[in-house]
Amino acid sequence: MPQFVLENNQVKLSVRKSPFIIRLVLYFFAFAFFTFPTAGTIASIALGEGLHFGFIIGIGIFSLLGFYLLRVALWNTYGEEIIAFSKNEIVYEANYGWSRDAKKIIKNESLTYFASPIGYEEDNEGILILDNGKEIIECAVKMPQQQIEEVIMLCKNNKF
């Protein structure tokens, strides 16, 4: 099954879902990093030990870690990259299912597409790279080399 779709001047690259147990562990730790420090702070206050500055630092640090783990879990579940082509520019955006990353915009002039191998050599996987000579869009979705070549051929044949 291909990991890409070309429609309406957009290429959508989809992430293969990671195994269920890995996603379950990621979601559990993301949830735990948000709730356990807060629950510990509430328990400390309820037991009469008061609120210490360390609790606030702990909640802050673990909330950042929890947010990062949630983002990784969402990427491994719903992740896709959207590359929108227009006459003058190319807009790249990573979609996490519940949120989206900041858009990266490059000029659509003297564009070259190529695949960069990634991972183990025997896996024969890589990532798609778009380069206009000044700026680069480097996709994060690992795809089989054959599918990347198909995406490159489709993008070169379509005049956006």
Model-based region annotation:
Residues 74-80, 87, 147-151:
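Cytosolic juxtamembrane helix at the C-terminal end of the final transmembrane segment
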Residues 23-36, 53, 95-104, 138-153:
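Extended intrinsically disordered, low-complexity coil regions enriched in Ser, Thr, Gly, Ala
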Residues 3, 80-82:
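Short, surface-exposed charged micro-motifs
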Residues 16-80:
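Alpha-helical transmembrane spans
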Residues 10, 82, 88-89:
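Structural motif
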Residues 1-7, 153, 157-160:
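Low-complexity, intrinsically disordered extramembrane tails and loops of integral membrane proteins
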Residues 1-19:
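Cytosolic juxtamembrane N-terminal segments of multi-pass membrane proteins
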Residues 17-19, 75, 89-145:
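Non-transmembrane, membrane-adjacent beta-strand/coil modules in membrane-associated proteins
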